[in-house]
Amino acid sequence: MFCRKYVFQTWKQLSRSYSTVNSIGAAKTRNIGIIAHIDAGKTTTTERMIYYSGRTKRIGNVDEGDTVTDYLPSERERGITIQSAAITLPWNQHKINIIDTPGHADFTFEVIRSLRVLDGAVTILDAVAGVEAQTEKVWKQASALNLPKVVYVNKMDRPGAGFSRTVQEVIQKLETRVVLCNLPYFETNKESDLEFKGVIDVIHQKLLKWNETDANGNEISVVNIDETTPDLLQILEKSRESMVETLGEYDERIIDSFLEHDENYLKIPPMLLDQVIRKATIDNYLTPVFCGASFRNIGVQPLMDGITKYLPSPLETSLPQITKNGKDVTKKVDGEKGLVVANDNNLTLALAFKVMTHSTRGPMTFVRVYSGKLNAASNLINTRTGKKLLIRKLLVMHGDSPEEVKSISAGNIGVIPGYETDFQTGDTLVSSAVAKRNFTAKDSAYRLLPIDIPPPLFNAAIEPHTAGDEAYMKQCVETLIREDPSLKVHLDKEMGQVVLSGMGELHLDIVRERLVNDMKAKVNLKDVVVSYKESFVGKREKEAVITNEEIEVAVTLSHIEDARDYVGQEGALVIEEDNNVILLSETASSEHVRATIDERRWKCENNLEELKEAILNGCLTALQMGGPILGFPLHSTLVTVNRWNVPVEVAQEQALNLMNASRQAVQSLKDEKKDFSILEPIMSTKVYVDSNDLGEVSHDLTQRCKAMIVEIQDQSTQNLETAAWAKDEAAKVYVPPDYTIKKNVSKFDDIANKKIIVAETPLREMIGYLSKLRALTRGRATFDMTLIGMRRAVGNRVDSIVEEYKF
């Protein structure tokens, strides 16, 4: 046995100069996200990575509020991640761009927009809780983007930690093959309890044991596992056999090596194992698994090794979807330049995936450069606006600390500072790697796949203290919306209030805190309420005709079930967020308008497309102005423009008149309340409870929360109704027994004794549910919700909603 500083700490000096790190090529760059359920240890793990890379001289602590990545006052006060933070680290002659994402369901959009620009992900699991609800949700989001992943089983030092159980859940719940790159190592303490001390490196056949006297986790004892350590050797042999069997089914080189080495699993070279694991990970064939206890500084360095060894570089990841004028463009990967688009080595394409306003540095736009090189002191075009901008400076962020750089090359993440109103989340930016280039309209035709924005579910009204405070309040709200596109705003004209709409209670609480505490806006804050809708449910279609001098618009209102049925239909504007459709066919224009076009007598100051857009905008405005019951926005409604006419042979502007007429036509159809109903959001709710609490929680759901229980599932891995493949795969993987569970059985609740209550619940009844659930179960239960859709409220439900919105 010998003791030394961990070998990769010798590379720490490189981190002192970002210019050195920035010179690292795409092949040795890793863009990764840290994803997990809340409280799994994402930020704690990230802070250790920052320290071990040499970026900081001390380890940031969530409890002490001095973390690098959680730097917002609200984050440090609450001890949770709210905004995704970006940081660049050097490690093992590689560059790792890390984004530490939120774990709370209210900030799912932060996760979504971060995943879009990443090449891989580290999924952190709590070894006591196992695979939790938000983990499953984010895993599916990452899988939909074909992101390769590694798993890190954290908190192995906690009573009740179950590595074996957690691995089985990974296979069955996340439906992935695994290879266990390291295993937990325990020693018995004076109280005869097992304590987590280190990890068994299955690939290199070593025991890594962290020195308890070193508070920062730098000193690690490395022990060869051989005949002198028979117990460890037995575990290693079984683990190696399981690893080789899994890898052998993927790559024949493993089988060949096994036969060449006298069918000895331990003699297969680590280098070959690493190569095959890397290839299989990038192909999403399997997931490497690591373990540790980040708070005690155990296991983080091997995880960082795994990131550089197994996750892909920008040269190896799935190519982004890029279009030009709606058509796919050619893409190829150059070993030196990275992604080359449209056979143009100098074409630079970047995606603005996040916009924020810093308290002292002002506006900051986070970008992922996909092709070419984004240079400081160069021009770019925002393809959404067509506007040409001079980029003066570029930054790379380390949590809350920026470093100015001369360029951001393909495959990297950086920041454009300044430009308060010029960028929005999802913008495609076009530039050139060469200094001088004349941009044309063709350059504005490029589009990277936009970022989907989920619909908001909760509302909260705000009012300025005085009329003099209104302008600054609106300015602050506009800033928040640019930063967070999942936050919506509309004006309640009747009440004179600005209404914010967000993803959840916590989401809106944080927004309101930022308005008052960070931005110093003088506003009154109202309670968070559910976002309801209204829908036309009349038995017949209703038609209205608005005639104003020579302008005429005729529209019909009807109910629809699924707006997606109209996607691709000619003349259909589909608003998926509200399940609405506006149908404007080519034949809707009057014979007079069509004849004017054919005879070339058109004198109107607006062209045909501008007039059509005016009609659509007028109809859309009317839908958003709400229904006749309580003024909620309309939902599941089809507006059909049957005909329209304007005097296009007259030389004057008609778009505004046509838009107003369209709005009035739709508004006139909302005169009778009996033709409309209130829709409320219905959630698919999963409540995770101990068997002992099942009855009381179920009763509370059905009686107080007005829930309809769909089924009750067993949460233990032995009874999960998963695919036969996942069960077979779990049976093939060797994991050592969870001795910690057996030894400490009296110190924690049996996790295998948990149930899942699956129910459909009105969202309104789930406000504040977490605190009530914890009170019922003494803090042992959790829950997760996803939106099923909007459902018609009937009977007493309507009365309670109307009562809620009386002012």
Curated annotation (Swiss-Prot):
<dbReference type="InterPro" id="IPR031157">
    <property type="entry name" value="G_TR_CS"/>
</dbReference>
<dbReference type="InterPro" id="IPR030851">
    <property type="entry name" value="EFG2"/>
</dbReference>
<dbReference type="InterPro" id="IPR000640">
    <property type="entry name" value="EFG_V-like"/>
</dbReference>
<protein>
    <recommendedName>
        <fullName>Ribosome-releasing factor 2, mitochondrial</fullName>
    </recommendedName>
</protein>
<dbReference type="Pfam" id="PF00009">
    <property type="entry name" value="GTP_EFTU"/>
</dbReference>
<dbReference type="InterPro" id="IPR035649">
    <property type="entry name" value="EFG_V"/>
</dbReference>
<dbReference type="GO" id="GO:0032543">
    <property type="term" value="P:mitochondrial translation"/>
</dbReference>
<feature type="binding site">
    <location>
        <begin position="154"/>
        <end position="157"/>
    </location>
    <ligand>
        <name>GTP</name>
    </ligand>
</feature>
<dbReference type="InterPro" id="IPR000795">
    <property type="entry name" value="T_Tr_GTP-bd_dom"/>
</dbReference>
<dbReference type="GO" id="GO:0005739">
    <property type="term" value="C:mitochondrion"/>
</dbReference>
<dbReference type="InterPro" id="IPR009022">
    <property type="entry name" value="EFG_III"/>
</dbReference>
<keyword id="KW-0496">Mitochondrion</keyword>
<comment type="function">
    <text>Mitochondrial GTPase that mediates the disassembly of ribosomes from messenger RNA at the termination of mitochondrial protein biosynthesis. Not involved in the GTP-dependent ribosomal translocation step during translation elongation.</text>
</comment>
<feature type="transit peptide" description="Mitochondrion">
    <location>
        <begin position="1"/>
        <end position="18"/>
    </location>
</feature>
<dbReference type="Pfam" id="PF14492">
    <property type="entry name" value="EFG_III"/>
</dbReference>
<dbReference type="GO" id="GO:0032790">
    <property type="term" value="P:ribosome disassembly"/>
</dbReference>
<keyword id="KW-0547">Nucleotide-binding</keyword>
<dbReference type="InterPro" id="IPR053905">
    <property type="entry name" value="EF-G-like_DII"/>
</dbReference>
<keyword id="KW-0648">Protein biosynthesis</keyword>
<dbReference type="InterPro" id="IPR005225">
    <property type="entry name" value="Small_GTP-bd"/>
</dbReference>
<feature type="domain" description="tr-type G">
    <location>
        <begin position="27"/>
        <end position="315"/>
    </location>
</feature>
<dbReference type="InterPro" id="IPR027417">
    <property type="entry name" value="P-loop_NTPase"/>
</dbReference>
<dbReference type="GO" id="GO:0003924">
    <property type="term" value="F:GTPase activity"/>
</dbReference>
<feature type="binding site">
    <location>
        <begin position="100"/>
        <end position="104"/>
    </location>
    <ligand>
        <name>GTP</name>
    </ligand>
</feature>
<dbReference type="GO" id="GO:0005525">
    <property type="term" value="F:GTP binding"/>
</dbReference>
<comment type="similarity">
    <text>Belongs to the TRAFAC class translation factor GTPase superfamily. Classic translation factor GTPase family. EF-G/EF-2 subfamily.</text>
</comment>
<dbReference type="InterPro" id="IPR041095">
    <property type="entry name" value="EFG_II"/>
</dbReference>
<keyword id="KW-0809">Transit peptide</keyword>
<dbReference type="Pfam" id="PF00679">
    <property type="entry name" value="EFG_C"/>
</dbReference>
<dbReference type="InterPro" id="IPR035647">
    <property type="entry name" value="EFG_III/V"/>
</dbReference>
<dbReference type="Pfam" id="PF22042">
    <property type="entry name" value="EF-G_D2"/>
</dbReference>
<keyword id="KW-0342">GTP-binding</keyword>
<feature type="binding site">
    <location>
        <begin position="36"/>
        <end position="43"/>
    </location>
    <ligand>
        <name>GTP</name>
    </ligand>
</feature>
<dbReference type="InterPro" id="IPR009000">
    <property type="entry name" value="Transl_B-barrel_sf"/>
</dbReference>
